């Protein structure tokens, strides 16, 4: 139901928007992203994983774009009894922009993300020792907001917050900064 409403909103937006001067066309880019993993089941602090994300997409006009992303984690983080490592991630997204000036474009973004990671926990509960080593896939609808700033006609930078996964007692989000090049 939510997906159908989202697709309808995108179609209406695409049909109502006119072309503009903002580097319409294909682009590629890369971001440094600090992924944040929260797991309420283990009552641990937020785990932070450094990662690199590659982006490629197409800006139809000033207001509408689509992009795909793929990335991988560089390391793992441990706090208390929990350890998390992100192996890889990929997804597809629709981006809606609202230009403030010729070079400043805040946006919202939504789509679907798949990730593979490993969650490890080791501890003791009521005198019983336990150990969890779970390599698993995370997939969910994703959304976020950010700002693109054009530095030149073909080079831009961006800052973004994204919620990639939020189910049950687990959440994966990310704050990123990066560069992109239009061609």
Regions found by a protein language model. Name each.
Residues 16-19, 36, 60-62, 95-102, ...:
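Outer-membrane beta-barrel proteins
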Residues 1-25:
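Cleavable N-terminal export/targeting peptides
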Residues 48-52, 84-90, 137-143, 171-175:
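Residues that define the transmembrane beta-barrel architecture of outer-membrane proteins
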Residues 75-76, 139, 143, 148-183:
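Predominantly the C-terminal beta-signal and adjacent terminal strand-loop region
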Residues 26-28, 63-68, 102-106, 149-159:
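Repeated loop/turn-to-beta-strand initiation elements of outer-membrane beta-barrel proteins
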Residues 54-58, 92-98, 110, 145-149, ...:
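Residues on the lipid-exposed face of transmembrane beta-strands in outer-membrane beta-barrel proteins
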Residues 20-74, 96, 114-116:
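Short glycine/proline- and aromatic-enriched beta-strand/turn motifs that initiate or cap beta-hairpins
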Residues 38-47, 76-84, 118-131, 169-175:
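Outer-membrane beta-barrel translocator domains and adjoining extracellular loop/strand segments
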């Amino acid at each position: 139901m939510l997906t159908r409403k989202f697709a309808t909103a995108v179609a209406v937006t695409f049909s109502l928007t006119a072309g503009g001067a903002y580097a319409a066309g294909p682009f590629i880019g890369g971001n440094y992203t600090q992924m944040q993993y929260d797991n309420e089941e283990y009552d641990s602090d937020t785990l932070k994983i450094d990662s690199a994300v590659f982006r490629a997409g197409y800006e139809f006009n000033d207001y509408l774009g689509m992009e795909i992303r793929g990335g991988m984690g560089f390391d793992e983080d441990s706090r208390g009894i929990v350890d998390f490592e992100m192996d890889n991630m990929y997804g597809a997204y629709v981006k809606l922009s609202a230009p403030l000036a010729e070079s400043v474009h805040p946006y919202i973004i939504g789509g679907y993300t798949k990730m593979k990671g490993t969650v490890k926990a080791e501890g003791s509960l009521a005198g019983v020792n336990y150990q969890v080593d779970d390599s698993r896939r995370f997939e969910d609808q994703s959304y976020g907001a950010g700002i693109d700033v054009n530095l030149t006609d073909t080079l831009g930078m961006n800052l973004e917050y994204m919620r990639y996964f939020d189910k049950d007692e687990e959440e994966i989000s990310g704050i990123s900064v990066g560069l992109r090049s239009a061609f």
